[in-house]
Amino acid sequence: MVELSGVDESTKKKELEDIFLDNISHELRTPLNALIGLNDLLNGVAGQHMEEEDRLIMKDHIHKNADRLMTVMDDILDLSRMQKGSLTIHKTVVSLMEICCKARDAVKGQVQPGVKLQHEYPVALKDTFIYTDGKRLEQLLRNFLLNACHHTELGSITLKVKAYRDEKRGRRMLQIRVDDTGEGIPHERRSLLFKPFRKFDGQMEGLGLGLAICRQIAKLLGGVVYLNTHYVGGSSFAFEMPFEEI
């Protein structure tokens, strides 16, 4: 029975890896085709007769597809580093507000029509600087936000930041949370969320790596990620870590 279970687990892993490879093909081809098509159109005869406003819109689409392609490549490289145990962080003094704003701005083009992207940032933390890996923290928040964008068709996506004191541990804690009004996540699927290659039913975009990478980044930053969700009524992904203002 144990041996059979091992075979089943191996087969399941192989199936997930095959799906992942198919997803890579789609996630690379889609932005590449868009980049080639938009560039040809912009530099062709039609582009020469475009209004400046239309040219700017085209350039914006090119930029968004380039960003999407870069995100895919970064996720693939980070997966490789995770499997080798070589995913690292480099801490510096960074602006907390700047990190949150960069993550929010990076996903604006992915928000579906009818969804409001907003943030709640305490005035008391506006000028806060912390010692952490700003690039990795931004990546974690961006993945949280992208996940919300993929599953929220109406309502809102809200990035919330707060600081509080954990009396039990005697430390000040930073919590950054992304709340959405999407479809929510069934209880039986929640344990799989932070594992590689996992995607929700009906999810068309993404490689299924973002949340797995988030969990690893959180550990390296000395924090944790967790989920609060209702099957009907949206989800809330949060990251918490101890911090001291610089």
Question: Positions of the model-derived regions?
Answer:
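A conserved beta-strand-to-alpha-helix junction within the catalytic ATP-binding
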Residues: H90-D105, E138
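Short alpha-helical segment of the dimerization/phosphotransfer core of two-component systems
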Residues: K64-L69
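Short conserved segment of the HATPase_c
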Residues: I185-F197
